Amino acid sequence: MKMRACKWLLTLAVAFAATLSSAYAASRIKDVASLQAGRDNQLIGYGLVVGLQGTGDSLRSSPFTDQSIRAMLQNLGISTQGGDSRTRNVAAVLVTATLPPFASPGSRLDVTVGSLGDATSLRGGTLVMTSLSGADGQIYAVAQGSVVVSGFNAQGEAAQLNQGVTTAGRVPNGAIIERELPSKFKDGFNLVLQLRNPDFSTAVGMAAAINRYAAAQFGGRIAEALDSQSVLVQKPKMADLARLMADVENLVIETDAPARVVINERTGTIVIGQDVRVAQVAVSYGTLTVQVSETPTIVQPEPFSRGQTAYEPNTTIEAQSDGGTVAILNGSSLRSLVAGLNSIGVKPDGIIAILQSIKSAGALQAELVLQ
């Protein structure tokens, strides 16, 4: 039953990859490329989450939390000299956010918070005012709001139950943008589109599609493929730049990608692209299981013999070898590759090893990506 499930899952993964490859061969430019001048920027900040129900940082184990509490209270005009704080309702957190391109002051962002100390849960807490800075050290946003946590943590004196991660959460729309990123989009005459998956065929096809549009609208060529990732677009003199990009990003192009096999060794997931080919190769698959069991015996001395208790080791070694199976794989198509692997009853972990060996033998005509 398990072997049938493994075969079904592998076949489903390959069929799904083949469906994606054929269904998404034609895509809009906005779905496969982005404007170089319109990239995202990362923001980061340090703050405090308050209002926790005894699940915050222990101030003895997290001295930076104690320092932050005192600094915050002093900024609010409250003196903290001569007193020791023993609260467990506050947690020090790292706050991160992504600033999208062309974001204007007053817009809101989602932020993510993560505990820095030994807090056990951020559920029910509130992030107090935290400034978010970019890589240049400038403050671009300020975050504050209630923290939403997906997991839960319950514990008693002798048992504890955890589900999900309770030491990290999100503050939806918790940050307000205070500073606009400098942008030369409106003043630019040359724009660069960057492919998310670099490929020369796709880049050349994108430039050709843009030039066909430009020939009909402006009577000339405006695009040129610079390399496998970048396509240069020159703004016509009488064109409105925003209108031009709106038309360009909705053009439909034929996308291409190299043959690729993606393997995640931790989860056993294997995704095989439709264009993967395997030269004729023989594969032998078999397993050897060795089990070592230790069953020591305690030998007690006779009464009044002045002997000592002895430890007598007892080791049992068993070896079991499953008969190896030989199959001829000729991957003229993706279906034949899957059928060949399934015919010898290979489990997902065995398929990973076989694919790596086929690649080492030079018979796998595809890029092997290990995650």
Swiss-Prot record:
<comment type="similarity">
    <text>Belongs to the FlgI family.</text>
</comment>
<keyword id="KW-0574">Periplasm</keyword>
<dbReference type="Pfam" id="PF02119">
    <property type="entry name" value="FlgI"/>
</dbReference>
<keyword id="KW-0732">Signal</keyword>
<dbReference type="GO" id="GO:0071973">
    <property type="term" value="P:bacterial-type flagellum-dependent cell motility"/>
</dbReference>
<comment type="subunit">
    <text>The basal body constitutes a major portion of the flagellar organelle and consists of four rings (L,P,S, and M) mounted on a central rod.</text>
</comment>
<dbReference type="GO" id="GO:0009428">
    <property type="term" value="C:bacterial-type flagellum basal body, distal rod, P ring"/>
</dbReference>
<feature type="signal peptide">
    <location>
        <begin position="1"/>
        <end position="25"/>
    </location>
</feature>
<dbReference type="InterPro" id="IPR001782">
    <property type="entry name" value="Flag_FlgI"/>
</dbReference>
<keyword id="KW-0975">Bacterial flagellum</keyword>
<protein>
    <recommendedName>
        <fullName>Flagellar P-ring protein</fullName>
    </recommendedName>
</protein>
<dbReference type="GO" id="GO:0030288">
    <property type="term" value="C:outer membrane-bounded periplasmic space"/>
</dbReference>
<dbReference type="GO" id="GO:0005198">
    <property type="term" value="F:structural molecule activity"/>
</dbReference>
<comment type="function">
    <text>Assembles around the rod to form the L-ring and probably protects the motor/basal body from shearing forces during rotation.</text>
</comment>
